[in-house]
Curated annotation (Swiss-Prot):
InterPro entries assigned to the protein according to its UniProt record, in alphabetical order: Creatin/AminoP/Spt16_N, Creatinase/aminopeptidase-like, Creatinase_N, Pept_M24, Pept_M24B, Peptidase_M24_C, Peptidase_M24B_aminopep-P_CS, X-Pro_aminopeptidase_P
Name listed for the protein in its UniProt record: Probable Xaa-Pro aminopeptidase P
Alphabetical list of CDD domains matching this protein: APP (cd01085)
Gene (UniProt): AMPP
Originating organism: Podospora anserina (strain S / ATCC MYA-4624 / DSM 980 / FGSC 10383) (Pleurage anserina)
Catalytic activity: Release of any N-terminal amino acid, including proline, that is linked to proline, even from a dipeptide or tripeptide
Cofactor(s) of this protein: Mn(2+)
Cofactor binding note of this UniProt entry: Binds 2 manganese ions per subunit.
């Protein structure tokens, strides 16, 4: 069929998958089956005080948060296209062609077809069913946003199948499953194809035309094409020539022909460029190919300033059109095929997250190896300039958050103001924007009161959010992009008198945060191995939280950065933490329809001195850089040990030393800061 990629036969690759039974939950009842698609509306997105991002497009949203969208007509149109292509199942991933977690509106296909707007999840549509699989961060949100056309697959729960298992079951009897090959990794695609055939299905086919795009039609937002700017050496700390030299050493070690980059943050980091094509993430649509002899950046050249072009030329980087990547990849495959007649060819490397389409264009398994990206590994270990930038921007950001919390308490308690969750988020952004090197937010602020705080990735929308209740928990998870670093901080507060239950929950979460922050571990330890430190106090009471404990953070890059993290994902088992990593430490506790608690700091991994050095290994620990006090009225001191009180006193002393000077002419904030940092 002309719609199907002509694919060579592939050898299936192994892929870790959690085992699960094949039970499928019943479709839940719709909250509002007649809700129409919310109209496109302007949202907060990257802003700049200088002219760095002056050409940034306005971010639009596809659905109002927590509103159910009627997907009946969309599903009918999609199924009609599926029948034309002899497909029984069609998979709609969350990601774009660069495996981005956060995506541009034009790539929000899963949101469009399902109505679910969380950042993680996969939609699977058959000719008579539809399922949405997502993880524990989004169970609450998905249950509110999905209409009655959809099953909710709660990934990781007992007796709930993975989306792959559900799709495979639906393909039994020789049926075909289709997917856009640019939106799925080759590892997942090849394993899924093998599983489908083993279960009696017809297999997985790559459909070149994205069927959701065809349903979306003229209403699909245009692809952003914003300007790109050069990040100076005073912020990057290392020039592109040096980074390319390091990458080429890795290619030589692996005896590779080259590395084809598809991850947007890796490309931005490698070439010391930043953009704004994806809201809150200073990246731009691009690809790159690096060999021992050349480096090519695939990008719309009109996006580059003269300064960027001069810099790239000086670093011997060739510029080619964004759309030429696949054609050039196919040419590389043809050359490799010709060369292989005389000698064993050197393979090209792609990221293990690279798309199925990219691997096929490069010639498949014969000419491609999928690896954990050497650029991603290098990016995750910050240099001294980047680390100092992270320290400095967190002082400024801490001052902004302190000013905001003091203002908010005064407004709610003393002024009796009626402020909704968006009012608060906007005020925080306004305060942040006054600080040096502020560029914009690093993600949409989670400003949540009461029961909304239990929605882990809640996003307030004007006209559909709550008035902040001073007598309920208030959770604020927010971050900013500065030229010298990226921030991500969560604080949970109560502006009235918290209940004993709320205080106990908060204190257990705080104890977990302190324990993980204080841990010392040998080099080679993974984030998986230390995750228990944050959960242990909740576990003693039979409590837990359904999200990871920590994620990597970029340096004026994506707020979620791999490959490192702290949690139970397989990659967190495989990837050891290293000095120079920057991660979040963010345990939490949530009661649906009641309240939510999360306490998040960012921390630098660094070498620490120990009395001994077993196995001649260096030992590592954390230096937390977040400079925001904890909520004193939510702390049950009777649950704290003397060591934990000492930790809090040291932390508060440092916060006071670093931020008090910002408030010499601000008596309200100064008084709030002094009160919240009093010794225990």
């Amino acid at each position: 069929m002309r719609h199907i990629w002509a694919l060579p036969s592939l050898t299936a690759l192994s892929l870790f998958q959690a085992s699960a039974a094949s039970a499928v939950p019943r479709a839940r009842q719709a909250i509002n089956t007649s809700s129409p698609l919310a109209p496109f509306r302007t949202k907060r997105r990257f802003r700049t005080q200088a002219q760095l991002l002056s050409n940034s497009a306005t971010k639009t949203t596809l659905v109002e948060e927590m509103v159910t969208v009627d997907t009946t007509s969309r599903l009918a149109a999609l199924r009609s296209l599926m029948k034309e292509r002899n497909l029984h199942v069609y998979v709609v991933p969350s990601e774009d062609s660069h495996a981005s977690e956060y995506i541009a509106d034009c790539d929000a296909r899963r949101t469009f077809i399902s109505g679910f707007s969380g950042s993680a999840g996969t939609a699977i549509v058959t000719l008579d069913k539809a399922a949405l699989a997502t993880d524990g961060r989004y169970f609450n949100q998905a249950s509110k946003q999905l209409d009655s056309n959809w099953y909710l697959l709660k990934t990781g729960m007992q007796d709930v199948p993975t989306w792959q298992e559900w799709a495979t079951q639906e393909a039994e009897g020789g049926k075909l499953i289709g997917v856009d090959p640019q939106l799925i990794s080759s590892a997942i695609a090849e394993k899924l194809d093998e599983d489908i055939k083993n279960a009696g299905g017809g297999g997985l086919v790559g459909i070149k035309e994205n069927l959701v795009d065809l349903v979306w039609g003229s209403e699909q937002p245009p692809r952003p094409s914003n300007s790109v700017f050069l990040l100076g050496q005073q912020y990057a700390g290392k020039d592109t020539a040096a980074k390319l030299a390091d990458l080429r050493k890795e290619l030589d070690k692996k005896k590779a022909a080259g590395f084809v980059l598809s991850m947007l943050d890796e490309i931005a980091w490698l070439f010391n460029l930043r953009g704004s094509d994806i809201a809150y993430n200073p990246v731009f649509f691009s690809y790159a190919i690096v060999t021992q002899a050349s480096a090519t950046l695939y990008i719309d050249e009109a996006k580059l300033t003269d300064e960027c072009k001069t810099y790239l030329e000086r670093n011997k980087v060739t510029i080619k059109p964004y759309g030429a990547l696949f054609e050039d990849s196919e040419e590389l495959a043809r050359r490799a095929e010709a060369d292989s007649k005389d000698a064993k060819p050197r393979k090209y490397l792609i990221s293990s997250k690279g798309s199925w389409a990219l691997k096929l264009a490069l010639g498949g398994n014969k000419f491609v190896d999928e690896v954990r990206s050497p650029v991603g590994d290098a990016k995750a270990v910050k240099n001294d300039v980047e680390l100092n930038g992270m320290r400095n921007c967190h002082i400024r950001d801490g001052a902004a958050l302190t000013e905001f919390f003091a203002w908010l308490e005064d407004q709610l308690v003393n002024q009796k103001a009626q402020l909704d969750e968006v009012d608060a988020a906007d005020k925080l952004e306004q305060i942040r924007s006054k600080h040096k090197d502020f560029v914009g937010l690093s993600f949409d602020t989670i400003s949540s009161t009461g029961a909304n705080a239990a929605v882990i990735h809640y996003k307030p929308e004007k006209g559909a959010c709550k008035i902040i209740d001073p007598n309920a928990i208030y959770l604020c998870d927010s971050g900013a992009q500065y030229l010298d670093g990226t921030t991500d901080t969560t604080r949970t507060l109560h502006f009235g008198t918290p209940t004993a239950k709320e205080k106990k929950a908060y204190t257990l979460v705080l104890k977990g945060n302190i324990a993980l922050d204080s841990v010392v571990f040998p080099k080679g330890t993974s984030g998986f191995a230390i995750d228990v430190m944050a959960r242990q106090f909740l576990w003693k009471y039979g409590l837990d939280y359904r999200h990871g404990t920590g994620h990597g953070v970029g340096s004026f890059l994506n707020v979620h950065e791999g490959p490192i993290g702290i949690g139970t994902r397989k990659q967190y088992i495989d990837v050891a933490l290293a000095a120079g990593n920057v991660l979040s430490i963010e345990p939490g506790y949530y009661e649906d329809e009641a309240f939510g608690i999360r306490i998040e700091n960012l921390a630098i991994v660094k070498e620490v001195k120990t009395e001994h050095s077993f196995g001649d290994k260096p030992y590592l620990g954390f230096e937390h850089v977040t400079m925001v006090p904890y909520a004193r009225n939510l702390i049950d001191e009777t649950l704290l040990t003397p060591d934990e009180k000492d930790w809090l006193n040291r932390a508060n002393k440092k916060i006071l030393e670093k931020t008090l000077g910002y408030f010499e002419n601000d008596p309200l904030t100064k008084a709030w800061l002094l009160r919240e940092t009093q010794p225990f």
